[in-house]
Amino acid sequence: MAGPSLACCLLGLLALTSACYIQNCPLGGKRAVLDLDVRKCLPCGPGGKGRCFGPSICCGDELGCFVGTAEALRCQEENYLPSPCQSGQKPCGSEGRCAAAGICCNPDGCRFDPACDPEATFSQR
């Protein structure tokens, strides 16, 4: 009698765990869910047309980049938000993302990068 009830308890506990069974695995496995939790960084700059790329960096396609200026002050709020954020579409440089035409930014700063220039991309084809 103890054997079947023990087996039922173990099966019940197994069903309640957060294991990734074949039928309910997310695409890319269990750890792929962590990548989906990235939100867009806070808007910043004139008219909120830019996005934060670091604690003192605000960039936008129409604006260019503001580094350490009043336009980038709002970006300091990102330090107090619990979830990670990501700005820019295309990865570039060392852990950076394209911030504006020809500019690649990471949380530490920005630099010119031809990979972020849409006109250069089309002219190379």
UniProtKB/Swiss-Prot annotation:
Pfam (any one): Hormone_4
InterPro entries: Neurhyp_horm, Neurhyp_horm_dom_sf, Neurohypophysial_hormone_CS
Modified residues (Glycine amide): 28
Signal peptide feature range: 1-19
Any one biological process term the GO annotation gives: response to external biotic stimulus
Tree of life domain: Eukaryota
Disulfide bonds: 20-25, 41-85, 44-58, 52-75, 59-65, 92-104, 98-116, 105-110
Keywords, in A-Z order: Amidation, Cleavage on pair of basic residues, Disulfide bond, Hormone, Signal
Keyword Ribosomal protein in record: no
UniProt-recorded Gene Ontology molecular function terms: neurohypophyseal hormone activity; neuropeptide hormone activity; oxytocin receptor binding; V1A vasopressin receptor binding
Gene Ontology terms: cellular component: extracellular space; secretory granule
Record's function text: Neurophysin 1 specifically binds oxytocin.
Family: Belongs to the vasopressin/oxytocin family.
UniProt subunit comment: Interacts with oxytocin receptor (Ki=1.5 nM). Interacts with vasopressin V1aR/AVPR1A (Ki=37 nM), V1bR/AVPR1B (Ki=222 nM), and V2R/AVPR2 receptors (Ki=823 nM).
The name this protein goes by in its record: Oxytocin-neurophysin 1
This protein's encoding gene: OXT
